[in-house]
Amino acid sequence: MGRPEFNRGGGGGGFRGGRGGDRGGSRGGFGGGGRGGYGGGDRGSFGGGDRGGFRGGRGGGDRGGFRGGRGGGDRGGFGGRGSPRGGFGGRGSPRGGRGSPRGGRGGAGGMRGGKTVVVEPHRLGGVFIVKGKEDALATKNMVVGESVYGEKRVSVDDGAGSIEYRVWNPFRSKLAASIMGGLENTHIKPGTKLLYLGAASGTTVSHCSDVVGPEGIVYAVEFSHRSGRDLLGVAKKRPNVVPIVEDARHPHKYRMLVGMVDVIFSDVAQPDQARIVALNAQNFLRNGGHAVISIKANCIDSTAEPEAVFAGEVNKLKEEKFKPLEQVTLEPYERDHAVVVAVYRPVKGKKV
């Protein structure tokens, strides 16, 4: 019996898959097709496969995964098909990959639809609970048929017609994480005028747009021009979103665009966040209005304990005529984050 031929690019993939073979040989190979592959294949690939996720190995095992090696093990593991997290943005990821709205399949993670899906109203106005195999938060889609960041959509027939809901992923939105964490009231409801500081690519802004509805308005402020481009794309399809690409430290630069608002939501992750919120409140927030502030402890003081940082920020808000109402941490969705709700210049005798 002769030695097997080491084919560098042939039809069958050679001894271990060849370098660019058609099928990738017996278990995947370096660049082959069938099951592993560095950039090819059907199941394992680093960047190209159908099932394997981000870490499918360099030609890994039968199912992809971190331990597949160059022509290696049988099933792999870390980012493979059966992984509880599905790789970085893989098939079953509850996080759906973080970051940009161009997340491809990643954002589809989070909820398994099932045949029977029931939608019930949440105690907070404009927010809903989708009950299937798993429960999830959702908002009524203002732009039917459109996903913003790859999130799942659920259509329910209510007799008069079909209503579409967008699943709200708490791993991608700090506001959703705070609701899941038990926040009593976000004060964002249908008809609310909202000033959103730190809008990023418009992920949470799009859900706020759904919540406030056509009677409300969302002024979305983002300093980064790159994120601002994505935000503009969201605003083009949503008439109640006003995109503002400007520094939230200088509210006078956009004072001609923003009217008086009921709520300020802040997610700017800056050391002087309390001051930024106070400046915007002085310009735009009505007396008795509310601020909902997402605090990232590491951005304010990376050496102190998170609880001490949160307490320090609350004290700064008190100095700026805010009265804190409630505070929740965002575990397990975000580490060392808290959301604080405060009322601005509370009106005597009026419920806050």
From Swiss-Prot:
Which residue positions does Asymmetric dimethylarginine occur at?
A: 8, 16, 19, 23, 27, 35, 43, 51, 55, 58, 63, 67, 70, 75, 81, 85, 91, 95, 98, 102, 105, 112
Cite the entry's keywords alphabetically: Methylation, Methyltransferase, Nucleus, Ribonucleoprotein, RNA-binding, rRNA processing, S-adenosyl-L-methionine, Transferase
- How does a null allele present? RNAi-mediated knockdown results in reduced 26S ribosomal RNA (rRNA) expression. RNAi-mediated knockdown in a ncl-1 (e1942) mutant background suppresses the enlarged nucleoli phenotype in the single ncl-1 mutant. RNAi-mediated knockdown in a ncl-1 (e1942) mutant background suppresses the increased 26S rRNA expression in the single ncl-1 mutant.
Pfam families in UniProt? Fibrillarin
Origin, by domain of life?
A: Eukaryota
The record's top EC class is transferase
Compartments annotated for it: namely:
Nucleus, Nucleolus; Nucleus, Nucleoplasm
Secretion signal: which residues? none
Q: Name one GO cellular component term.
A: small-subunit processome
Q: How is it modified after translation?
A: By homology to other fibrillarins, some or all of the N-terminal domain arginines are modified to asymmetric dimethylarginine (DMA).
User: Is Methyltransferase one of the keywords UniProt gives this record?
Assistant: yes
Disulfide links within the chain: none
Biological process according to GO:
box C/D sno(s)RNA 3'-end processing; nucleologenesis; positive regulation of translation; rRNA methylation
List, alphabetically, the PROSITE patterns matched: FIBRILLARIN
* Reactions catalysed, as given in the entry: L-glutaminyl-[histone H2A] + S-adenosyl-L-methionine = N(5)-methyl-L-glutaminyl-[histone H2A] + S-adenosyl-L-homocysteine + H(+)
Q: Does this UniProt record's set of keywords contain Transferase? A: yes
Comp. bias regions, Gly residues: 8-18, 26-59, 66-113
**E.C. no:** 2.1.1.-
Task: Cite the residue spans of the region called Disordered.
Answer: 1-115
Q: Extract the GO molecular function terms from the UniProt entry.
A: histone H2AQ104 methyltransferase activity; RNA binding; rRNA methyltransferase activity
Q: Quote the function comment for this protein.
A: S-adenosyl-L-methionine-dependent methyltransferase that has the ability to methylate both RNAs and proteins. Involved in pre-rRNA processing. Utilizes the methyl donor S-adenosyl-L-methionine to catalyze the site-specific 2'-hydroxyl methylation of ribose moieties in pre-ribosomal RNA. Site specificity is provided by a guide RNA that base pairs with the substrate. Methylation occurs at a characteristic distance from the sequence involved in base pairing with the guide RNA.
Q: Which family does this protein fall into?
A: Belongs to the methyltransferase superfamily. Fibrillarin family.
The record's annotation in NCBIfam families points to: PRK04266.1-2
Q: What is this protein called?
A: rRNA 2'-O-methyltransferase fibrillarin
Q: Which organism is it from?
A: Caenorhabditis elegans
